Amino acid sequence: DLWQWGQMILKETGKLPFSYYTAYGCYCGWGGRGGKPKADTDRCCFVHDC
């Protein structure tokens, strides 16, 4: 779930997941902006969204 994802990101990267990934790439965050995923993390968001 979203809470577990956030905890994993914080533990592994030390970054606050919601402020860092809310607008990351083309697909992370609320809705997708379309286009080709920019990186592996963005690709993961793409797979989750689609």
UniProtKB/Swiss-Prot annotation:
Disulfide bonds: 28-45
InterPro entries, per the entry: PLipase_A2 (IPR001211), PLipase_A2_dom (IPR016090), PLipase_A2_dom_sf (IPR036444)
Domain of life: Eukaryota
GO CC terms, sorted: extracellular region
Gene3D superfamilies membership: Phospholipase A2 domain (1.20.90.10)
Reported cofactor(s): Ca(2+)
Localization in the cell: Secreted
Keyword set, alphabetical order: Calcium, Disulfide bond, Hydrolase, Lipid degradation, Lipid metabolism, Metal-binding, Neurotoxin, Presynaptic neurotoxin, Secreted, Toxin
PANTHER family the UniProt entry points to: PHOSPHOLIPASE A2 FAMILY MEMBER, PHOSPHOLIPASE A2, MEMBRANE ASSOCIATED
Enzyme class: hydrolase
Job description of the protein: Snake venom phospholipase A2 (PLA2) that causes irreversible neuromuscular blockade in chick biventer cervicis muscle preparations. The neuromuscular blockade is mediated by inhibitory action at the presynaptic motor nerve endings. PLA2 catalyzes the calcium-dependent hydrolysis of the 2-acyl groups in 3-sn-phosphoglycerides.
Comment field (misc): Negative results: does not show myotoxicity.
Gene source species: Bothrops marajoensis
Binding site for Ca(2+): 27, 29, 31, 49
List of catalytic residues: 48
Example of a GO MF term: calcium ion binding
Protein name: Basic phospholipase A2 Bmaj-9
Keyword Magnesium found: no
Catalytic activity of the protein: a 1,2-diacyl-sn-glycero-3-phosphocholine + H2O = a 1-acyl-sn-glycero-3-phosphocholine + a fatty acid + H(+)
Record-stated family: Belongs to the phospholipase A2 family. Group II subfamily. D49 sub-subfamily.
